[in-house]
Amino acid sequence: MAPKTIIEKIWDAHTVIGEEGKPSLLYIDLHMVHEVTSPQAFEGLRLAGRPVRRPDLTFATMDHNVPTVDRFNIQDQIARKQIETLEANCKEFGIEIAGLDSPNNGIVHVIGPELGLTQPGKTIVCGDSHTSTHGAFGALAFGIGTSEVEHVLATQTLWQSKPKTMEVRVTGELAPSVSAKDIILAVIAKYGVDFGTGHVIEFTGEAIRSLSMEERMTICNMSIEAGAKAGLISPDSVTFEYLRGRPNAPKGEAFDVAIQQWEALATDAGAVYDRVLTMNASEIEPMVTWGTNPAQGTGVSQVVPSPDDAKDENERRAIKQSLAYMGLEPGTPITEIAIQHVFIGSCTNSRLSDLRTAAELIKGRKVADGVRALVVPGSQQVKRAAEKEGLDEIFKEAGFEWRDSGCSMCLGMNPDTVPEGERCASTSNRNFEGRQGKGARTHLVSPQMAAAAAIAGHFVDVRTFQSEPQTV
């Protein structure tokens, strides 16, 4: 038998019907549902008189529209309707839901892993583009549209064209204060927002292996920003230890058996990818996006580029348009860009380790005058754990707002938005025009970089900032 990549192994194991050159019917192991992309899907089932095929393989939560202050008092009529509709649909169709009053409520891509629902070798879908987050566990996880949500609810299967395979090999060792977020931003800045189109990416190399599970989730979360169908990392001992004891993970001897099965998922020696790209981690510095797509980013020691630096006319126009929207001048040092807002949260960087990293840098310091800074845990479970460690007090004493969980300022679908023309250092995953509110200017950064910007009032090189004296 020819050597296979992990991508091919999972695909082949889940193919119900498949023919070379034609779409395959894939079996879906886990379907996660939220309030925004599911209402029409459930209504389609209702009109057709169909039940949910496998409610036991379906899990729901609400996150996009949830207020992070006074979360039970939802002022927006559409948001309130979507949340109420999800609750009613889950009750009618027998689906487990982590509602607003649940201790397990949170962002769908945070609670799936922490509850042990996400496991190696699974096919996982959700009506959300950042479903790729779950690929950090060695799962084939990708976002789907509302009509596909209905198809999975009805059949527990999905027609999909087989993707090409890609390896992104990250060699070397990260410098201190350089993070997983910087890796993925650097990869996208180097290769662009479409290099992954038509592919599923496997991230490999010693720099990837050295990351924690939460850091790996950050990497896979943003694989969609490279245009990829999904991104994943082969499971290893780090994966297994994270899953051990999780509520929905196998227990006892079953867990030992599962580990043997999960270990067999690793890409075979000699397996051939359709494309291979490389990145040296030791060359990566803390990253900041300056434009309106995730590829428009650079190291913190650099300057805002000029349209004259473009390699072709299309890129020149794109740079010019982005600079106009962002209100930036070519040649401006990144460290001279002032910010008015800081957001530490989202399905990219709202886990406990992200909050610990930010709190460590913030402790004993104060948020700069004129800066509004928010910390939004990715789940109620993360929030409780952070409060148990006293992280909330560190943030509040520094002048940050400490919130309940939710998608929050990542997108302008809830009360947490950035005013028009103002600038935000954000740990989220997208910096498109209007993403955080009409006219909002978003700079994507790591939690460390966001925390440092909150204190300084502008971007700073976190590598040297950490050594500066703290106030008492």
Curated annotation (Swiss-Prot):
Residues 290-304 have a biased composition (Polar residues). It holds the Pfam family Aconitase. It is an enzyme of class 4 (lyase). Pathway: Amino-acid biosynthesis; L-leucine biosynthesis; L-leucine from 3-methyl-2-oxobutanoate: step 2/4. PANTHER family: 3-ISOPROPYLMALATE DEHYDRATASE, HOMOACONITASE, MITOCHONDRIAL-RELATED. Its EC number is 4.2.1.33. Belongs to the aconitase/IPM isomerase family. LeuC type 1 subfamily. Signal peptide: none annotated. Its cofactor is [4Fe-4S] cluster. [4Fe-4S] cluster binds at C347, C407, C410. InterPro entries: 3-IsopropMal_deHydase_lsu, Acnase/IPM_dHydase_lsu_aba_1/3, Acoase/IPM_deHydtase_lsu_aba, Aconitase_4Fe-4S_BS, Aconitase_4Fe-4S_dom, IPM_dehydratase_rel_enz, IPMI_cat. One of its GO terms (biological process) is L-leucine biosynthetic process. This is 3-isopropylmalate dehydratase large subunit. Keywords: 4Fe-4S, Amino-acid biosynthesis, Branched-chain amino acid biosynthesis, Iron, Iron-sulfur, Leucine biosynthesis, Lyase, Metal-binding. Binds 1 [4Fe-4S] cluster per subunit. Catalyzes the isomerization between 2-isopropylmalate and 3-isopropylmalate, via the formation of 2-isopropylmaleate.
